[in-house]
């Protein structure tokens, strides 16, 4: 039986978390963009972690829902056929399954994410 009283795993400070090199961003549409991250928890369908990426343009078509909370940096997200919106530190967004559009990362971005 799973102990639901324990709070694990735990990350005290997403801004200071040590990240692993995750290599180049496959979704990049310009110069290569480098990513790093830390997976806090995953179960095969859902995942929680910290992700960081260098500046540049990218294009996404999401196959899952994604919740993001920006820790540092800023980017402009533009859904296909929609309006651009800038997201920066302290802001939160949800990208529903099927969301498609571009992310223009202006400054190295670090986000806490939940894929579900």
Give residue ranges: language-model regions.
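Conserved hydrophobic/aromatic beta-strand scaffold that supports enzyme active sites
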Residues: 48-50, 67, 92
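Short, conserved beta-strand element in jelly-roll/cupin
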Residues: 53, 62-77
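A short, N-terminal "cap"/entry segment at the start of jelly-roll beta-barrel domains
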Residues: 1-45
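Short acidic-glycine-tyrosine-enriched beta hairpin
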Residues: 81-97
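A short hydrophobic beta-strand segment most commonly corresponding to one strand
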Residues: 94, 107-116
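Conserved short histidine dyad/triad with adjacent acidic residue
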Residues: 42-62, 96-97
